[in-house]
Amino acid sequence: MQAPLSGLKVIEFSHMVMGPCAGLMLADMGADVIKVEPIGGDKTRRLRGAGAGYFPMYNRNKKSIAINLKSTEGKAAILKMIKEADVFIENFRPGALDKLGFGYDDLKALNPRLIYCSEKGFLDGPYSHRTALDEVTQMMGGLAYMTGPPGRPLRAGSSVIDVTGGMFGAMGVMAALNERHSTGKGKYVSAALFETTVFLVGQHMAQKSVTGTPAAPMPARVSSWAIYQLFDTKDDEQVFVGVVSDGQWKILCNAFGLEHLLEDSELAENRDRVIHKDKFLPQIVEKFKLLTKAELMEKIENLGLPFSPIGKPEEMFDDLHLNAGGGLLDMEMEDGERCKLPALPISFDGERLGLHLDPPKAGEHTVELLQKLGLDIAELKSKGII
């Protein structure tokens, strides 16, 4: 399969997660993405703890050039690349690239067809000067409030705003590229962490508008469904089960010897069952507790009802479905070790997007890329430019 974005040329000035994620989306779909790094490499490479996975996860299928952008020759080399590029992606603080001569106005003058994508903390407005982080905007935009129990705001269990913000940036880039087919002109595209967070909690804002009551944090919420929770099993494990229709309710009751519940008029519809949980939930808890995790999941799956074990990230490496369907990409890390990481969750005509470049070593493609520009590699090295 020819990748959908094959032939697209992208220059990426980014670090951490949001900008690299936007570049990853385009790279996985076939774009030729060149990651521009300082001498010594992007500092994201050296993060530890919770940040140790950022670089390998969000920088596959890219080429790396490490160069001194503050030098006249280094800057000129990258500008030469940008002149022939389709897309430029950056996620630095406001004004940082303008000082280096890589701001939107500078690059628009150089390449009027360029799509310039800025991944920011905030879109235009009173907060746009602020420095933001994923966790800052999760707290600020209401997501942390909705995730933790009352009085204990809690960030989501991944860099969900960075990743989603990167996705919105990539979406904006592709829309601008489509528009360019008719206008012949580039465009400035921006996505931001704060606005991304607010978009994700939009359902709770709408709930307040519809009901007149503010949404409660998820651990304290009143579920829309009568059965939509974790259940303990015989072997002290847990399984989530959701019953979201009257038809599923009948299937559950018949399968677990609870036919008498179907005769109760107060339990006939989901909205009634939400009110009268005390009449049936203890009985379901008791029935499920008689089965092991494996037994309960097998039975629920055979019934066609929604269910899930409580998975951990490290368990996904060996997941049967992911491995069978091309959902994991086997790649070589910077230290030479191999690792399977999630593919982009999209298929085209049933085919998954694959790996064509391992996460690059810092400056791995510097010589290759500069030679294409006809530059003197030895001279650049002697001057410390690369």
Task: Enumerate the predicted regions with their spans.
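Flexible, small-/acidic-enriched active-site or ligand-binding loops
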Residues: 333-381
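N-terminal helix-loop segment corresponding to the beta1-alpha1 unit
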Residues: 1-172, 176-182, 361, 367-386
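Aromatic-enriched alpha-helical interface/lid elements that frame and gate functional surfaces
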Residues: 227-303, 307
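Conserved Rossmann-fold dehydrogenase catalytic segment
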Residues: 150-158, 181-197, 216-223, 265-268, ...
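Mid-domain beta-loop-alpha active-site segment that forms a flexible
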Residues: 159-174, 193-201, 244, 248
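Glycine-rich beta-alpha junction loops
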Residues: 40, 121-123, 193-198, 235-237, ...
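Oxidoreductase and adenylate-handling cofactor-binding alpha/beta cores
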Residues: 144, 166-186, 199-211, 253-260
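Conserved PLP cofactor-binding pocket of PLP-dependent enzymes
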Residues: 301-325
